[in-house]
């Protein structure tokens, strides 16, 4: 059995760690609320933009644009959105597992656009070519950052470096649930159903379509960045909460061991005293 001194030292260490994980949980909870608000605000905008784009594409069926044109697929691009830091449970692991499954099932050459250090570092050790990297986006992704990623990907697509592009990210479901998701980004698919809402376009539907298509790509990237950040904070809050609870249980077990060690020491001391007294008789 460990000595009482060793057990006390372990209790202090676990208690210090518990304070850290508790603080990290509170910080993650605060950031989660802000990230969740942004996700909720971004989703309707993305849906409405998609609806307008669908109406335009339907009304201007003869309009050709590089982002709408399908071509024979040889190289597929995966934009994988992971975190820059760890301590967020299975957030990165689950997404990378889904990405690996998609790569294994893919019949074409796959190239990665890594967003976040965790994904970048993981695939640097593998055999999948990473053609672009974006790290250090912080806890508050901006539209400017999303635009930079989108323009890079659009350039790769229009140059023929990529023939299809997919976004792989964690969709935010709730604070305790994140869903690894894959959606097609390029070429932009025309929705099968559109609303009956009538739109009046100025100066012309064709000019607006040309402007909206890149904007749509930027918006989708921005939305998925926000989804990923909210998911990351939810996963981190859950992980740190579990770590705090585990620390509490460990302290309780160590305290019980300490009490037993004290009791054993007292019993031994009493036995020695009684034994010494008996020897003097």
From Swiss-Prot:
The signal peptide, as residue positions, is none
- InterPro entries cross-referenced by the UniProt entry: ATP_synth_F1_ATPase_gsu, ATP_synth_F1_gsu, ATP_synth_F1_gsu_CS
Primary subcellular site in the record, as a coarse category: membrane
Q: Which UniProt keywords apply?
A: ATP synthesis, Cell membrane, CF(1), Hydrogen ion transport, Ion transport, Membrane, Transport
Q: Which CDD domains match?
A: F1-ATPase_gamma
Q: Does the keyword Secreted feature in the UniProt annotation?
A: no
UniProt cross-references to SUPFAM superfamilies, sorted A to Z: ATP synthase (F1-ATPase), gamma subunit (SSF52943)
Q: Name one GO molecular function term.
A: ATP binding
- List the disulfide bonds in this chain: none
Q: How does it sit in the membrane?
A: Peripheral membrane protein
The protein's location, in the record's own words, is: Cell membrane
Q: Which parts of the chain span the membrane according to its record?
A: none
Q: How does it assemble?
A: F-type ATPases have 2 components, CF(1) - the catalytic core - and CF(0) - the membrane proton channel. CF(1) has five subunits: alpha(3), beta(3), gamma(1), delta(1), epsilon(1). CF(0) has three main subunits: a, b and c.
Q: What is this protein called?
A: ATP synthase gamma chain
Name its species: Desulfitobacterium hafniense (strain DSM 10664 / DCB-2)
Q: Upper lineage ranks?
A: Bacteria, Bacillati, Bacillota, Clostridia, Eubacteriales
What is the gene called? atpG
């Amino acid at each position: 059995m460990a000595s009482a001194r060793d057990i006390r030292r372990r209790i202090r260490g676990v208690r210090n760690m518990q304070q850290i994980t508790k603080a990290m949980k509170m910080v993650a909870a605060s950031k989660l609320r802000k990230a969740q608000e942004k996700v909720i605000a971004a989703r309707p905008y993305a849906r409405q933009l998609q609806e307008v784009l669908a109406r335009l594409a339907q009304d201007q069926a003869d309009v050709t644009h590089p982002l709408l044109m399908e071509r024979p697929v040889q190289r597929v691009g995966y934009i994988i959105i992971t975190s820059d830091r760890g301590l967020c449970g299975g957030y990165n692991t689950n997404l990378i597992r889904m990405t690996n499954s998609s790569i294994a099932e893919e019949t074409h050459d796959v190239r990665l656009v890594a967003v976040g250090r965790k994904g970048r570092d993981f695939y640097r050790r593998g055999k999948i070519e990473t053609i672009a990297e974006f790290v250090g986006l912080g806890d508050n992704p901006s539209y400017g950052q999303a635009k930079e990623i989108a323009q890079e990907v659009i350039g790769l697509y229009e140059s023929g470096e990529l023939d299809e592009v997919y976004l792989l990210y964690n969709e935010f479901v709730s604070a305790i649930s994140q869903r690894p998701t894959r959606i097609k980004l390029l070429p932009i698919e025309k929705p099968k159903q559109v609303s009956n809402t009538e739109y009046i376009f100025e100066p012309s539907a064709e000019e607006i379509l040309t402007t909206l298509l890149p904007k749509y790509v930027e918006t989708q990237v921005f939305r998925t960045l926000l989804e990923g950040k909210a998911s990351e904070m939810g996963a981190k809050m859950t992980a740190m909460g579990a770590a705090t609870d585990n620390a509490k249980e460990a302290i309780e077990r160590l305290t019980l061991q300490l009490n037993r060690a004290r009791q054993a020491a007292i019993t031994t001391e009493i036995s020695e005293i009684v034994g010494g007294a008996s020897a003097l008789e």
